């Protein structure tokens, strides 16, 4: 029996996911072909597999979303068998992103810290659903000069760091050249701190970080008109991540509020883990 493996398409929706960390592979067992996934990321991943079979059948429906735990060596995806004698083959496409895309519930009541040091104040140059680049996106842009220390708004696990880009522009090519740090939270949400400096990360993938911890240095990389910190808290999705509006402690920390465009917010409190 000859099995022809054809890879039609495989792509990563989240650019930080490494093809060295996510591997789909096949093994022969008792005359069957078993497809497995290896996940060496520090985050669970959502994986959608679509198979095209010729003279083969799958034990279960192959078009399925799988939630693969972090640091998994061998997660069974599909079991394929030949239908009759003769040439047989399979091809596949897949999508993969950080986190659990089936998750709909998160901690609505969690209060975030402002993502900078005590005593500093910065304004929001573009708010939730901003008219410039935040249409239908719940993200915030802090007017932050290059070289400013960025602190974690919430504790969690670092799941991605990109810091090798050094340029900025308004061309399409620069949309994928923003440096950033991604931190996953206990409730399944993920925070994205973008446009950090070249080599500006102060944490590494796999690190556990506390609220208020220094995580990066702000910069001006990627698709920008000037230096700023782009912050978004989101739940993952294959086509588009679901940005969330979250509240922050402001002033001396007694007030929790949604941040508004063109307003300045001072952080006069120390972060509490």
Regions found by a protein language model. Give the residues of each.
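Bacterial Sec-dependent N-terminal signal peptides
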Residues: 1-22, 37
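Asparagine-centered strand-capping/turn motif at beta-strand->loop junctions
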Residues: 36-43
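Short, hydrophobic/aromatic beta-strand segments
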Residues: 43-51, 152
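Short beta-strand and strand-turn-strand segments in soluble, beta-rich domains
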Residues: 54-63
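Surface-exposed, glycine-biased beta-strand/turn segments
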Residues: 67-177, 270-273
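Acidic, glycine-rich catalytic/binding loops that coordinate metals and/or anionic ligands
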Residues: 110-116, 125, 171, 202-210, ...
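Short histidine-centered loop motifs in beta-beta connectors
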Residues: 145, 188-212
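Short, well-structured beta-strand-loop connectors
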Residues: 150-160, 202-218
